[in-house]
Structure formats: C-alpha cells, structure tokens
A protein has these predicted regions:
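Beta-hairpin "wing" of winged helix-turn-helix
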Residues: 66-86
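Basic amphipathic alpha-helical segments that dock to polyanions
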Residues: 58, 62-65
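C-terminal regulatory/oligomerization modules of transcriptional regulators
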Residues: 1-11, 72, 89-90, 95-138
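Residues within the helices of the helix-turn-helix
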Residues: 44, 63, 83
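N-terminal helix-turn-helix DNA-binding core of bacterial DNA-binding proteins
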Residues: 14-57
Length: 138
C-alpha cells in the first residue's frame, strides 16, 4: 500500500522515513534539543549535559548532523582555536517538533514528568506563544 502511494506521487521514499533516518540516531535529538532550548554551541557543553554520550559518539553525531545540513561547524580564530556549532534553517525547524514532543509527554506521561503525577497543559507549564529557548535560558 505504501509503495503504491509513493509510486503514485513520484516519490522515491517515504518523507517520514527520511526524517526519521535524519534524526533517529541515538543522541541526535538530544543535541538538537540542547542547541534549540539551551542555546548550547560547543562540544564540551554537549558532552557535559547529555547523559551517556561519549566523545566518540558526540563527534560522529555532530559530523552526521553537519552532513545532513542541520548544523554548521564554525572555527573561531582564537588561541586556542575554538569550534562552535550553529543551527541551519533546516535545524531550526525542529523547535516546533520538540515542542510537540514536550506536549505529548506533559499530557500523556505526567507520572514520569511531574512529581505529583498530575497531567497539565503544556502551555500552562511553559507559557503561551513563548519560544522554548526563553524558558531554558540561564
């Protein structure tokens, strides 16, 4: 059925499968979350805040994300040289997706999310029409 649908519309692959392939590797969404929500830009920041990620895996994921066009690697000419990562327009499109993932958990997994286990509306917790990054800024 899916194959027929793809063929009908001249598609080579399912766009959802393609997106899952792009961000579905372990820690990729965590890196995007930290870039979008925490405004993190440096390797050491990711390494210190993503539980369980190794330097090797982080390096691999950042390279993959750069190849996918989600981030750009910027070399800052200081001594010592610093590397920062920036979201591309493509990478920035994940903010509403992350917000939807947050809404899902707040609504359907309150026992895991909240100490009292009571469901809440996402906007009641994080505010309406507020970019998530403003909630997470230090």
């Amino acid at each position: 059925m899916l194959t027929a649908h793809l063929k009908k519309y001249g598609m080579k692959r399912c766009p959802i499968d393609n997106s899952i392939k792009m961000i579905g590797r372990k820690f990729t969404l965590h890196i995007l979350r930290n870039m979008i929500l925490l405004k993190q830009r440096r390797f050491s920041q990711f390494l210190g805040s993503i539980e369980g990620i190794s330097t090797k895996t982080l390096s691999i994921r950042l390279n993959e994300m750069e190849k996918e066009g989600l981030i750009t690697r910027v070399v800052i000419s200081t001594k010592p040289v610093q590397i920062e990562y920036s979201l591309t327009e493509k990478g920035e499109t994940f903010e509403p997706i992350l917000k939807l993932l947050g809404k899902l958990s707040v609504k359907y997994e309150p026992a895991i999310i909240f100490k009292d286990g009571k469901p809440r509306d996402f906007e009641d917790v994080f505010g309406r029409n507020v970019r998530l990054s403003s909630v997470y800024d230090y």
